[in-house]
Amino acid sequence: MDKILFDEKNHKFILIGFAESKDEQGIPSNQYLIQHKNKSILIDPGGFGLFPILLSRLLKYTKLQDIHTIVLSHQDPDVCGGLNIWLEMTEAEAYISNLWLRFLPHYDIKRIDRIIGIPDEGMDLTIEGKFYLKLIPAHFLHSPGQVNVYDPVSKILFTGDIGAGMLPCSENNLFVEDFENYKKCIDGFHKRYMASNQALRKWVKNVESLDINIIAPKHGYLYKGESVKKLLEYLYDLKCGIDLL
């Protein structure tokens, strides 16, 4: 399934993959594409097995030569296992936390020269003219070097594994419709994969100042409206990781 989440003037934010690959049994994932004028940004393209279906979707909206940037939230294979083929097929530069630069060669990536490290404090990534993406640190929230992506035009925050849910679960469609019912789908994951409540609170305080219309995680349903507020409140109070030892 692909769905345009935002479309205004020369700017789009598109969900191009939603938890449907048969190769991803147990860990279904979401992939996103941002288009700004003639520049396209691919977020967390996933493993090699996803390439054919993502390519067919992507070509509905853009051209391979227009993929300007790839942003990787962290080092896991469901995020960047297929990175080599995207670097071979495009001229894009890929961005990932500095922490993971020395590990990526283990994915047999040939074009390491086109991978750029993101500093621990995050950065504003200029795409064209005045348009930029905010790359926001989310360290120790699953990965010790995780990065979120905020698009100030669409007001969509890509949160990587934060807010992730295991599917199929609950009676939702694309967006979380009943957060209280959906909590059982995210509770176990967050208690095990997030390092601590201290890390969660630091992240919540960092992002709650943003104007957010949609939270788009790497796995599971998306959040909008009241569910954005409820997710942040839930995470702020959650005991997880080392809190449970």
Identify the role of each PLM range.
Residues 47-48, 77, 164, 222:
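Short, glycine/acidic-enriched loop or turn micro-motifs at the edges of active sites
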Residues 50-95:
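Active-site metal-binding motif and surrounding structural segment of the metallo-beta-lactamase
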